[in-house]
Amino acid sequence: MSKYTIGIDLGGTTMTAGIVNENYEIVGKLTWATRLPRPAEDLEKALADLCRTVARDNKVDFADIKYVGIGTPGSVNFTTGFVGFNTNFGYYDWNLGPDLEDLLGCKVYVENDANAAAYGEYIAGGAKGYNDAVVITLGTGIGSGIILGGKILRGFNFAAGEMGHNVIVKDGIQCTCGRRGCWERYASASALTRETKAAMQADKNTIMWKMTQDLDHVNAKLAFDAAAKGDETARKVIDSWIEYVGVGIANVINTFEPEVICIGGGVSNQGEVLLAPVRAYAENETRNITTGKFPVICACQLHNDAGVIGAAALGSSI
């Protein structure tokens, strides 16, 4: 009986493949550059080579691989393995799953990368042990994956869970999706970076200027570090940003009432400095609607391994 699966986290810069055992533990992994742009056929061959190489490097016979799972950006039909459109790669109507099955000679599952990462947290991370979970990643945008009754919520067009594009400010900041006021324009890590830069430009006396003299080096962590040193300007930026995070989390609770919400992305490394006020804000916003036990709000545990583990577990998500 096959003991291993391979999970692939396919990104625009790198692609990582991991050999995962029956306990959802990574026993070996390998990362290669994605090397875009290139034809889809070339990338498929590289993915097949990556799978065979990670198996060989870890002394696993490829015949012992039960299946391969892939998490990729884009609109993914999980049933067919068909990627309708991948904006990161510029591929339209990409027949990824069937093509890779032909190259590898085994079953291949393809899933949206946010869903795969969420499933990883559900299987082996911060959402383990819960039936209903939402995983939110605060990064360049806001990624989200929803697990209800132990199953990924995909929607009839396989596009469910785009929580980052829920509008929270009418006629607000323009979003790349075409709408205005989307949650990710206010609560993503890039939104925090944008507001930090604006605050620094408005206040030349903030200690953030002593921490970096170049606005191009400002990141989402800077305001947290400055606020911890007592900087009032940084504290105002953080408080405003956390309120926007809390608004979206309250919407998640009112919509899905999950048992647990896991927050990921680099800013989640702030731990309770981030989580405690988000928890308090969301609880206050939902207390007159949601009765009973408030959802657990915690940080993701698997970090960069969530996508690999989730992809490797896709066969159990059916």
Predicted region positions:
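A charged helix-plus-loop insertion that forms the helical arch/lid used to bind
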Residues: 81-92
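Short loop/edge segments at beta-strand edges and connector loops
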Residues: 110-112
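Short beta-strand segments
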Residues: 9, 69-73, 135-141, 145-147
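Adenylate-forming
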Residues: 117-123, 144-146, 165-166
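Short hydrophobic alpha-helix segments
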Residues: 30-32, 87, 156
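A short acidic/small-residue loop/turn micro-motif
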Residues: 33-35, 91, 159-162
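Short, charged low-complexity linear segments at domain edges
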Residues: 146-162
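ATP-binding/phosphotransfer module of carbohydrate and carboxylate kinases, centering on a glycine-rich
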Residues: 1-67, 77-80, 98-108, 123-130, ...
